[in-house]
């Protein structure tokens, strides 16, 4: 395929992670070094920034600050949860995107996000093809939920898993201080897939983690849960996914309001407090509910070096493949074992195979009682959390990237 000259846009979407900026760095640095990419723009707040023509000129940034993106949590360019309509029903947004693309001669579009973001990528790519505008569109994976279909794992997951396991090991120490015993229930993110909550098993592997783990891959039964807790003696720690549900599909923690996000997902929360109140009422024991909430997705101080390196690799691969003539793909990971050691390589998946699909924990990795995970899961996740990054510090506090965010004219 002939060389395509033009500008590129990198956008970030959905929930932040501790390494999404590392992927952005991979895209930005590789694009700046590319001979056929004329300008590199960062979209303010994802696709909304494109629609509003608010694009940052990334060539104006200090290279040292760009380098710090690898160690900066959250979404440095700004994120959004904006659901684009089907272009066959309403193409207003798509016409506007085309207008902005033409204004800045954008020929490469990279979107860094999860399931919904890949759907956005797919829709934009198909529309550009329909109207005959040549633009190569690539998805860069991101989600702590680890539920993107077709990839071994997702950037962001390993660091969150490491944070969860470490935090629960620390909570375990606190929960076992008193001789009176305590039941501690920890709520962890995960709507339909329990990859994050299952990571708590890493703490248990080293003797300081939850006794019971409940995932959304199986139905939750309150009576069985209470019976499981009763069986534990002394102090008991429980890890639960926010998305655990009853047999009828209703979420245990679903908010009593009708609030949803931009993609129609129900707002969940308060599960730990709910279960804690029920257990306290039934047992009379001392019970504490803990919700890790946003901390699990922005804990860059506990990031996995492996995760950071792979996040950069994903961004770099997206640009290299697009420049080589590839479009309509998402960068994905596949693992290999070389001389007994874990190795991660990139592959490409069609956006149509990824958009709006979810990958869940294999049921055979969950124990027969549905309150824990097996060794297969430990073997899967342990290589991903390895390595301690040398985090930049200033007065013993983290030194994060400070971007100038100069708007393109």
PLM features: residue spans?
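Glycine-rich oxoanion-binding loops at beta->alpha junctions
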Residues: 1-2, 52-107, 116-117, 155-156, ...
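Gly-rich Lys/Arg/Thr-decorated short loops/hinges at beta-loop-alpha junctions or inter-strand turns
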Residues: 4-10, 69-83, 142-152, 179-182, ...
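N-terminal phosphate-binding or glycine-rich loops at protein starts, especially the Walker A/P-loop
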Residues: 2-54
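C-terminal non-catalytic interaction/assembly regions of soluble proteins
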Residues: 254-409
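Short glycine/serine/threonine-rich phosphate/pyrophosphate-binding segments
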Residues: 17-27, 50-51, 93-95, 115-123, ...
């Amino acid at each position: 395929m002939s060389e395509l000259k033009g500008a590129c846009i990198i956008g970030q979407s959905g929930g932040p992670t501790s390494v999404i900026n590392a992927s952005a760095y991979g895209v930005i640095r590789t694009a700046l070094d590319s001979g056929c990419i004329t300008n590199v723009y960062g979209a303010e707040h994802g696709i909304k920034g494109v629609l509003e023509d608010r694009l940052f000129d990334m060539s104006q940034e200090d290279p040292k600050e760009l380098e710090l993106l690898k160690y900066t949590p959250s979404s440095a360019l700004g994120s959004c949860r904006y659901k684009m309509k089907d272009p066959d029903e309403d193409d207003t947004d798509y016409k506007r995107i085309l207008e902005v693309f033409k204004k800045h001669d954008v020929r490469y579009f990279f979107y860094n996000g999860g399931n919904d973001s890949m759907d956005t990528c797919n829709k934009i790519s198909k529309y550009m093809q329909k109207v005959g505008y040549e633009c190569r569109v690539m998805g860069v994976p991101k989600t702590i939920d680890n539920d993107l279909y077709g990839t071994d794992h997702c950037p962001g997951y390993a660091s969150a898993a490491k944070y969860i396991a470490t935090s629960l090991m620390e909570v375990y120490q606190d929960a076992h201080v008193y001789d009176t015993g305590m039941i501690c229930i920890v709520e962890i993110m995960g709507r339909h897939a329990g990859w994050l909550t299952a990571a708590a098993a890493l703490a248990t592997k080293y003797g300081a983690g939850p006794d019971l783990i409940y995932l959304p891959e199986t139905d939750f039964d309150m009576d069985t849960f209470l019976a499981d807790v009763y069986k534990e003696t002394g102090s008991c720690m429980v890890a639960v996914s926010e998305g655990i549900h009853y047999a009828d599909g209703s979420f245990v923690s679903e908010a009593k309001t009708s609030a949803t996000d931009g993609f129609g997902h129900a707002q969940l929360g308060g599960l730990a407090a709910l279960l804690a109140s029920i257990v306290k009422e039934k047992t009379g024991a001392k019970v504490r509910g803990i919700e890790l909430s946003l901390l699990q997705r922005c804990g860059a101080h506990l990031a996995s070096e492996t995760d950071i390196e792979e996040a950069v690799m994903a961004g770099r691969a997206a640009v290299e493949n697009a420049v080589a003539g590839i479009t309509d793909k998402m960068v994905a990971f596949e693992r290999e074992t070389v001389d007994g050691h874990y190795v991660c390589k990139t592959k490409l998946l069609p956006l149509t195979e990824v958009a709006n699909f979810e990958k869940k924990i294999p049921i055979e990795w969950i124990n027969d009682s549905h309150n824990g995970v097996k060794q297969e899961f430990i073997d899967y996740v342990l290589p991903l959390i390895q390595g301690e990054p040398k985090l930049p510090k200033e007065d013993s506090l983290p030194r994060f990237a400070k971007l100038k965010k100069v708007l393109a004219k």
